[in-house]
Amino acid sequence: MYRIGVDLGGTNIAVGLVDENYKIVCKKSTPTGAEREGELIIEDMAKLCFDVCKSANVDIKDIISVGIATPGIANHDTGVVEYSCNLPFRKFPIAQILSEKLGGVKVYIDNDANAAAWGEAVAGAAKGTNSSVMITLGTGVGGGIINDGKIFSGFNFAGAELGHIVIEHNGRKCACGRRGCWETYSSATALINMTKEKMDECQREGRTTLMTEMTAKSGNISGRTAFDAMRAGDAAGKEVVDTYLSYLITGLVNIINIFQPEVISIGGGVSNEGQWLIDKIYPDIHEQQYGSGIVDETKIRIAQLKNDAGIIGAAVLGM
């Protein structure tokens, strides 16, 4: 009983053979070559599907289904990628073409963030729940919503863009063109920008900060710089972390008040802070949520599937 998950990214295509226990039996990848025609990208996807089957001595005919997690607007009803800013897909029937190349195996598609959220709901931090949300704190803030046991993507399949809820009126400029989007305050990119700004502020004011020393040693500023400095007793590092977490909390409270999910799982680089992060934000979130102390509380958890979320989430799209 095997399924195949295809994690289609702007940089790499990763394909995994997933068993009935949601474990990846075999995984292979190749550069996407996003500048190429869509047909050529699908050729590589098909080849990887055959390769993982061959490595595990599984016949492609015995595959229950294949799922594709793709960036952009994915119409899961028709199997068409309506639009992707990172890939050459416009009204592109990706599911039909891949299915034909695989000998008729059923192919499902969805947005990559939705697929990751579905993976956490089926096999990860939200397993056993009927409603959940997953957010990914990386270059941006990705979001996926599971409502009544189904992926929520809106009537036009472009919903669940949680990173673009506005939390600061006329705030920081976002890549989407608007101002004040949550991802400009709560992504790993935003955290790095806050760290740089605080280091510059300290230099102007003649204050010392361990963040400068850490950056000199490592050669770069990362999402860990402020957290590591804070843990070492650095006041400026603590200021960065406190500011960052306040924005993260604001966005999470908004999500809870709108959807009241059973579980919110947090993935992406910032989630590597682990249980400390959950313990730090949990009290403020539930103090601020609507109906605090009266309604059942949403649980906040670290996502479990990590870097395999795309493959596993895609593989279980047919469930």
Residue ranges and their predicted role:
Residues 113-115, 139-141, 306:
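Acidic, glycine-rich active-site loops and adjacent beta-strand->loop/helix elements
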Residues 7, 67-71, 110, 134-140, ...:
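Short beta-strand segments
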